[in-house]
């Protein structure tokens, strides 16, 4: 089976969940104050909202939502919480798009392996781990705009640069496990270079002086 990087998490969903995914994606891209989606469980809605943001790092301006529902309706009203005003979102989107394109231009003529090394080196040298864990540090605007990010923000920055350079890449996630002392999810990347799949964890590397962690998936 061939893995698909574009809308990777979308393809993990069932038919009804895909409809919600699409509605969330469109609503966030249009920066709507609220929009209607199929009534699913709170857990499903939360997971889908998260999946949209994993597949689409360019949606960096909303990390959570609330919703209203009515007992006799098959729909719920989903209300995104935005990190910035509408005008600021437009401004930041243009800035991030320009930033990504300028960086990609520096590597567009390189081989796949060289492109991956370029992205790796850029993140390791220019992004610091944000111990304060600000909300924007989970997004590309933290990594590419402010030079600080947590694992999620770094992994999304890697993905959006890989997407721009035509490299297969997804954001991979581990589960939280409080019973074993694992309080938070960890995010890294799975990439495909010359037909082979690798794990790439730039967060690990920023803590270990740029030591590369790129492990082939057998």
Predicted regions, residues:
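Linear, non-domain "peripheral" regions
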Residues: 1-98
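Short, well-ordered strand-loop elements centered on a beta-strand within folded domains, enriched
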Residues: 76-78, 142, 146-148, 196-202
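Secondary-structure boundary elements
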Residues: 86-144
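Intrinsically disordered, low-complexity coil segments
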Residues: 102-106, 145-146, 175-184
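Catalytic cysteine-centered active-site loop
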Residues: 130-133, 137, 148, 169-180
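Conserved active-site-adjacent core of cysteine acyl-enzyme catalytic domains
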Residues: 135, 139-145, 149, 153-160
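Hydrophobic/aromatic-rich core segments of domains that either
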Residues: 153-218
